[in-house]
UniProtKB/Swiss-Prot annotation:
It holds the Pfam family Ets. PROSITE patterns: ETS_DOMAIN_1, ETS_DOMAIN_2, ETS_DOMAIN_3. Gene3D superfamilies: Winged helix-like DNA-binding domain superfamily/Winged helix DNA-binding domain (1.10.10.10). One of its GO terms (biological process) is negative regulation of transcription by RNA polymerase II. The keyword Nucleus applies. Interacts with SIRT7. Residues 5-85 bind DNA. GO terms for molecular function: chromatin binding; DNA-binding transcription activator activity, RNA polymerase II-specific; RNA polymerase II cis-regulatory region sequence-specific DNA binding. Residues 116-127, 299-312 have a biased composition (Basic and acidic residues). There is a cross-link at residue 166 (Glycyl lysine isopeptide (Lys-Gly) (interchain with G-Cter in SUMO2)). GO terms for cellular component: cytosol; nucleoplasm. This is ETS domain-containing protein Elk-4. Residues 116-138, 245-279, 292-325 are annotated as: Disordered.
Length: 430
């Protein structure tokens, strides 16, 4: 027997064989039949399909598939009783089953196609659909249409693709090589100039440092709102001089060489007639006196004659400086024999607070003094009482009383370098 037979065809075959009447039999002439020995029929169906564990439960579930296909239906109220939906037409399928059993495959295919056409014209019975589908599929596969179509399409498409790839690949490679060759040179030309411009602004800043003085008032006003306690550290003395001209208010903690390099460019014009300072530093600072003169803003016109006299006198004889301007974060005692001992590397710094001196550089030019006073006035809780706020940014603030006095004086707010307080009220007179 053929294992490709369907379940409804197997049942119809058993009904047509008289030796199987003890297992299955017709109950009426309208296509009803009953399974007398349901388990035996299920066992035979399992042998046909090579499923030894077949039973009636599985067989009944398989019959439900034909309920949907409208081939077999269950008779209500009767156990093991089923019915072929279109019984007269279902008998025409007997030659198919017999042909399958005998092995006449060619006759089977022809009969299936003819029966499927008859069923389609009838419109009621659909049993031959599975057979018709298989036969039509087999006919389509064995015919030359399927194979010739796919092979021809693949051959033509492959030839075209291979030709196009062989022609286009060298051109694409050449185009990519040409496009990639100029790129390294372009990158080199772009990157090599980019490394040099950072050096140019430093030289330009040195060249144009005197021209920055007219905009000092605007820079002070901008720094009042934008200044912060922590700014990037200054690495070279040249950057410190630039910041002094632009009134940068917060010089951070410099390294140890910075206080040693500052004295040559920080001697101030004499403002009083009190010679109390050693002459060693004056001889060292005689050469770079021109830079503070160029960097000073408004006091240049007022005290221009005094630095010139100092220059002439320094060449002939040693003359002691007359005044010393200090930042608000310094304490000078009267017992110190040399007030400028802090500037020489060999002399001890016993007259100063070491922490304050390491964090606050000494600026002897008038313009950095104004900037530092103005900056500390912005941080002070008594900002309206600070001298820079009272006299404004247009006029240069000086301390004649402090510079002319010989006695020791202290500045308030020396507890920490970050929060210095304002000057005492007596310092604001005149």
């Amino acid at each position: 027997m053929d294992s490709a037979i369907t379940l409804w065809q197997f049942l119809l075959q058993l009904l047509q064989e008289p030796q199987n009447e003890h297992m299955i039999c017709w109950t009426s002439n309208n296509g009803e039949f009953k399974l007398l020995q349901a388990e035996e029929v299920a066992r035979l169906w399992g042998i046909r399909k090579n499923k030894p564990n077949m039973n009636y439960d599985k067989l009944s579930r398989a019959l439900r598939y034909y309920y949907v296909k409208n081939i077999i239906k269950k008779v209500n109220g009767q156990k093991f009783v089923y019915k072929f939906v279109s019984y007269p037409e279902i008998l025409k399928m007997d030659p198919l089953t017999v042909g399958r059993i005998e092995g006449d495959c060619e006759a089977l295919n022809s009969i299936e196609t003819s029966s499927s056409k008859d069923v389609e014209y009838g419109g009621k019975e659909r049993p031959p659909q599975p057979g018709a589908k298989t036969s039509s599929r087999n006919d389509y596969i064995h015919s030359g249409l399927y194979s010739s179509f796919t092979l021809n399409s693949l051959n033509t498409s492959n030839k075209k693709l291979f030709k196009s790839i062989k022609i286009e690949n060298p051109a694409e490679k050449l185009a990519e090589k040409k496009a990639q060759e100029p790129t390294p040179s372009v990158i080199k030309f772009v990157t090599t100039p980019a490394k040099k411009p950072p050096i140019e602004p430093v030289a330009a800043a040195f060249a144009t440092s005197p021209s920055l003085s007219p905009s000092s008032e605007e820079t002070i006003q901008a720094l009042e709102t934008l200044v912060s306690p922590t700014l990037p550290s200054l690495e070279t003395p040249a950057s410190i001089s630039i910041l002094a001209t632009t009134f940068n208010p917060t010089p951070p903690v410099p390294s140890t060489p910075l206080p040693l390099k500052e004295p040559p460019r920080t001697p101030s014009p004499p403002l009083s007639s009190n010679p109390d300072i050693d002459t060693d530093i004056e001889s060292v600072a005689s050469q770079p006196m021109e830079l503070p003169e160029n960097l000073s803003l408004e006091p240049k016109n007022e005290d221009s004659a005094l630095p010139e006299k100092d220059k002439t006198n320094n060449s002939s004889r040693s003359k002691k400086p007359k005044g010393l301007e200090l930042t608000p974060a310094l304490v000078v005692t009267g017992s110190d024999p040399s007030p400028l001992g802090i500037l020489s590397p060999s002399l001890p710094t016993a007259s100063l607070t070491p922490a304050l001196f390491s964090q606050t550089p000494i600026l002897l030019t008038p313009s950095p003094l104004l900037s530092s006073i103005h900056f500390w006035s912005t941080l002070s809780p008594f900002a309206p009482l600070s001298p820079a706020r009272l006299q404004g940014a247009n006029t240069l603030f000086q301390f004649p009383s402090v510079l002319n006095s010989h006695g020791p004086f202290t500045l308030s707010g020396l507890d920490g370098p970050s929060t210095p307080g304002p000057f005492s009220p007596d310092l604001q007179k005149t």
